[in-house]
Amino acid sequence: MLKVYSPHDLHLIREIPFSKPKEIERSLERAEKLFKDKKNHIPAWKRIEVLEKVVEIMESKRTLLAKLAAEEGGKPLVDSIVEVDRAINGVKIAISYSGVMSGEQIPMGQTMSSQNRLAFTIREPIGVVVSI
């Protein structure tokens, strides 16, 4: 268990269980397997829907999230409210980019060999990400 203490007065805030290495490996393998099968990819409209729900939940629990952040960080509540608002805005920014993350056309026709050719980039996920 990871014990989280308040930096303000060192009281125990919460105990959080660690994942065992095998559990982590299984989770990563499952995530990679799902990722490699393109039919499992979530379309942009659904990702937007999920992120909008995240914003809704965060906004409804804004005070609780701020109190938890203040307690864990040992900082004033007013600073934690700013932190929570910044996190909510970060999700909103992600939503705004979800529909426009497309590729670009690359100018061609600048040499004889590139005449009548089309080149473009596409943006797509490259794999599983792990974060702590």
Which role fits each region the language model picked out?
Residues 1-117:
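N-terminal Rossmann-like NAD(P)+-binding subdomain of aldehyde/semialdehyde dehydrogenases
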